[in-house]
Amino acid sequence: MSKYLLVDIGAGTMDVLYYDDADRQHYKAVVASPVIQVANQIAADSGDLLVTGVEMGGGPVTRILKERAKTASVIVSVSAAATLNHDLQKIASWGIDVVPDQDAEKLKSDGGCTHVCLADLDPQRLANIVKGFGVPFSFDVFGICAQDHGVPPRGVSHLDYRHSCFVKMLDNKPFPHTLLYEKNAVPEEMNRLRAIAR
């Protein structure tokens, strides 16, 4: 008998499914995706901004940070910068300063900027969603799905790179579960999934 929590982190929504196979009890919730929540958090404030955290899905966050950089100082830690682009020079060309993680931590403690932390997984938010189901936050299986393009070599598109990674794995073992990774076995090039697994 097992209790499962499955989370699909998408561009617009985060889908959460709880299932207990002992009594076939299941609950689901569809909420705003983390990237939408973070973009809204950034939009709700004005002025200088410090962004730390890890790589996450980035479309709306990237757009709003590029806009903010036109009117205020935007400083992003190297670890969080991968959300925007893997090319740090490109990020700098948008007027966004990229700094080492240690420098970002010092700036955070100085308190001179509004601070936003990037992450696809907010454990407290997830715990609150599950609390709404009326079940304990304790599972035998916890699965998370997120689209990770990987870190392609220079000159290769993210889409082509991701597809080549998938083809390589599926050619070797042509089953959908080939694309499932244990927490400690996420491939090196999958930064976003590795950040979620931590």
For the regions a language model picked out, list residue spans one by one.
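Nucleotide/phosphate-binding catalytic cleft detector across ATP-hydrolyzing
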Residues: M1-L5, I9-A11, L17-R198
